[in-house]
Amino acid sequence: MAFFVPLHPNIKTMQKVIGIGETILDIIFKDERPRVGEYDSGLQPIGAVPGGSVFNGVISLGRTGINAAFISETGNDRVGRKIIQFLEDNHVDANSINVYPESKSPISLAFLNEKNDAEYIFYKDHPHDRLDFVFPEIQADDIVMFGSYYAVNPVIRQQVQGFLEYAQEHGAILYYDVNFRASHQNEVVKLNANILENLEYADIVRGSKEDFEVLFNKHDAETVYKAQVSFYCKNFIYTQGSEPIEVRGAGGFSRQYPVAPMSTVSTIGAGDNFNAGFVYGLIKKGITREMLVTGLAPELWDALVGEASAFSANVCGSIHNSVDEAFANQKKRELEVCLKEKEENI
């Protein structure tokens, strides 16, 4: 069994974050990069960074001082070793990473368009995916982040579902980022049961406008919430790029949050770090599962969406998939002050 040593040993009440998802090496290209010389193909990458939907958010949380761990799989190669080292360098427990000696670690090619939105091509060589891991220690109000195709993949569904049930039984807060790509649209019917189960496990569901158009052919937050989400989960976040964020919550909460204009270098990690900022806010504000069930006060929702938006904006300013060091250090200091004040008031 993997145990987690708190990064702040003097603060005994800090919630842990456990992410479960894919690991991948993102090789990033800029479609509009000017060619230099007659023989320049215009295809030279502008960067290569470890990534994965939940992975990116967990890295940001590790950088901000959150006690974080990650469950995933890699191949036994240079890419896999780089990914594990990257987790450890960013203070994320990597003890639950499966290394398969017969497999190659996955990579993706990400092509940024003129708006710096990414189009992906994925390459994966895991012929026998099985996700064999020992469940980490989970206590009440720890936070589990899951999502993307990894959370509905039939090949590893039994293991993922078993972990989600274990986390739920132990009182964890489950945060589900739907993140369902159009490339899997032909599998929607086959995966529908897994998607609905995930909605039922979740205490918080976040998805983008594109996710729900692909999954349910529905085009606005209110319709998605009432028709597809609210029966399973009352706390719902609907993002739509530069358009306002829509939030629905237990107790009838409903609010729209404008997205501040920003110049972007890459939007690859925008949604992933929105998730990270929201989870950071849950810990900073001491949100419990019981509070989510009964309904959060409007000012708490405001604070959570504010943190989520700040994390997302920061990561859009570079080609990296997680928040930068200066931002992370600032958030780490804020968290330490906040948790210390709470400890003194106990």
Regions found by a protein language model. Give the residues of each.
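Glycine-rich phosphate/adenosyl-contacting loop at the front of the ribokinase-like
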Residues: 3-92, 342-346
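A short, aliphatic-rich alpha-helical micro-motif
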Residues: 137-139, 198-199, 230
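Conserved N-terminal subdomain of the carbohydrate kinase-like
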Residues: 67-148, 333-346
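Short, conserved phosphate/pyrophosphate- and ester-handling motifs at nucleotide-, phospho-/glycolipid
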Residues: 61, 208, 271
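Conserved beta-alpha-beta core of the PfkB/ribokinase-like small-molecule kinase fold
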Residues: 152-226, 243-244
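Conserved phosphate-binding/catalytic region of the ribokinase-like
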Residues: 6-18, 221-346
